[in-house]
Design a protein with these regions (language model features):
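Active-site-proximal, Lys/Arg-enriched surface segment
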Residues: 35-121
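Short, conserved catalytic/metal-binding motifs centered on acidic residues
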Residues: 1, 12, 32-36, 72-86, ...
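Domain-level cores of phosphate- or acyl-group-handling catalytic modules
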Residues: 136-193
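Short, structured patches in soluble enzyme cores that scaffold and shape functional sites
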Residues: 118-120, 131, 164, 184-188, ...
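Electropositive, glycine- and tryptophan-enriched low-complexity nucleic-acid-binding patches
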Residues: 96-156
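An anionic, glycine-rich sequence signature occurring as long contiguous blocks
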Residues: 181-247
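Gly/serine-rich nucleotide phosphate-binding loop at the start of the catalytic core
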Residues: 1-30
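Short alpha-helical "patches" and their helix-cap loops
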Residues: 10-21, 54-56, 127-135
């Protein structure tokens, strides 16, 4: 779906009548959504990863990759995604969960993976992904993925961006040990770091600016927090608040 820039394989199938999918004999060459899904499900990731790296190397050599923020360099975004779910079929790689339905509690089996994309000026570029295994959480899968990225793409990025689930000391230490910076969402209001940051933000005047569409942005940026002792170093906390005026 990332390569086709479509939201689903069904959306891709709707374009099969377009001229660019037809050969000189006017026959349609785009497979159905089911066929595309069946073929991709049998693809070995070991063969896909070299192809993804080749795309990156060529684009880098052709200078078609430009950083979104030149002063910060390139960033990798890590995020978990659920690819499929079923109540009737499962495999050795499925993750089980209990779901409350009208018929009672049922066991649902699903697949989940962590994706790594390179953020650049014109969008994102898929680098790699890692399946989440039974009995582990998303961060464990992301840690394996990140170690492989450090080996396969040692100079491709300078920054790792993730959501609040990744705000853990071992994960941040792994990133820092490889000379990279990390950004994660801080949303657990029980943490000392969150409480200390909110206390200082109340005492500091924000930087205020206007955006298109009647949006007012307030930003706070404070460094030197020591309220995360497990990390072993000071951290920086940034807060933003947007207010939109509706007439």
């Amino acid at each position: 779906m990332l390569l086709s820039r479509m939201g689903s394989f069904n959306a891709l199938e709707q374009t099969k009548s377009c001229f660019y999918w037809k050969k000189e004999d006017k026959k349609e060459v785009l497979p159905s959504a089911d066929t595309v899904g069946n073929v991709i499900s049998d693809v070995d990731l070991a063969t896909v990863r070299p192809a993804l790296k080749q795309v990156y190397v060529r684009r880098k050599r052709n200078k078609s990759l430009k950083p979104l923020f030149p002063k910060l360099g390139f960033a990798v975004i890590l995020d978990g995604h659920e690819s499929s779910a079923s109540y009737k079929r499962c495999c050795c790689g499925c993750l089980p969960r209990k779901v409350e339905t009208d018929a009672g509690t049922r066991i649902q089996f699903y697949h989940r993976h962590v994706t790594a994309v390179l953020l650049h000026r014109d969008g994102v570029l898929l680098l790699d992904l890692e399946m989440q295994r039974p009995g582990e959480d998303e961060v464990a899968a992301a840690t394996r993925l990140l170690k492989r990225l450090f080996h396969d793409y040692p100079r491709a990025f300078d920054l790792v961006i993730a959501d609040g689930l990744y705000a853990r000391a071992p994960f941040f230490k792994l990133v820092k040990d490889h000379g990279k910076d990390a950004i994660a969402v801080l949303k657990d209001d029980r943490r000392d770091l969150f409480q200390d940051a909110m206390g200082l933000f109340k005492q500091e005047a924000p930087v205020v600016f206007e955006r298109d569409g009647g949006v007012t942005c307030e930003c706070w940026d404070i460094e030197g927090f020591t309220s995360w002792p497990q990390l072993g170093q000071d951290v920086r906390v940034v807060r933003s608040r947007e207010t939109k005026t509706v007439k």
